[in-house]
Design a protein with these regions (language model features):
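Non-transmembrane amphipathic alpha-helical segments
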Residues: 29-43, 60-63, 67
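Soluble, cytosolic/nucleoplasmic coiled-coil alpha-helices used as oligomeric scaffolds and tethers
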Residues: 46, 53, 70-73, 77-80, ...
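Amphipathic alpha-helical binding modules
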Residues: 82-143
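Short, charge/polar-rich alpha-helical segments
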Residues: 8-30, 42, 46
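Amphipathic alpha-helical coiled-coil segments
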Residues: 58-78, 101-108
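Short Lys/Arg-rich cationic patches that frequently serve as NLS/NoLS or arginine-rich RNA/DNA-binding motifs
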Residues: 1-8
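Short, charged, amphipathic alpha-helical segments
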Residues: 50-59
Length: 143
């Protein structure tokens, strides 16, 4: 072992391999999120019952969550196993363009998920069954 080199811990290696495995599924998870978004928008456009819209909204939320987790895993995998234990190594690696691409994609997906959670969910079917009225904030135009 060369002087100055740190040995990668077993936990860091295991975390790295788990992230590599999750990152390998990113394209599939992103496609699933796009399909879930398309199905949810279609249910909204056709005026499907609220129970159907709510189920599609939940599916979209789960798909966006999975895709976001995979993007962050790809970011950590791009940094490498040394980044799990060494914060300076991780910080330097985060400055590379390859890691920036994954960070941007993960933050884009996270923003989509948060926007969907804040404004995309229809009323819960249980509220409709109980005869509860859901307050809606009127849309305002931004100047």
């Amino acid at each position: 072992m060369k002087k100055g080199r740190t040995k990668i811990s077993a936990t860091a290696e295991a975390d790295y391999l788990a992230d590599v495995a999750l990152a390998a599924n990113f394209d599939q998870l992103l496609s699933r999120a796009q399909l879930a978004d398309q199905e949810f928008r279609e249910a909204q456009a056709t005026g499907a019952p609220l129970a159907v819209q709510y189920a599609r909204a939940r599916d979209l939320d789960a798909a966006l969550t999975d895709a976001t987790r995979a993007a962050y895993a790809a970011q950590r995998a791009e940094i490498g196993p040394a980044g799990y234990d060494d914060r300076i190594y991780r910080r330097k690696a985060k400055a590379t363009s390859a890691v920036h691409r994954w960070t941007d994609e993960a933050e884009r997906l996270l923003t989509l998920r948060e926007t969907h959670r804040l404004s995309g969910f229809p009323a819960r079917p249980q509220a409709d069954a109980l005869g509860l009225e859901i307050a809606h904030v009127p849309a305002t135009e931004h100047a």
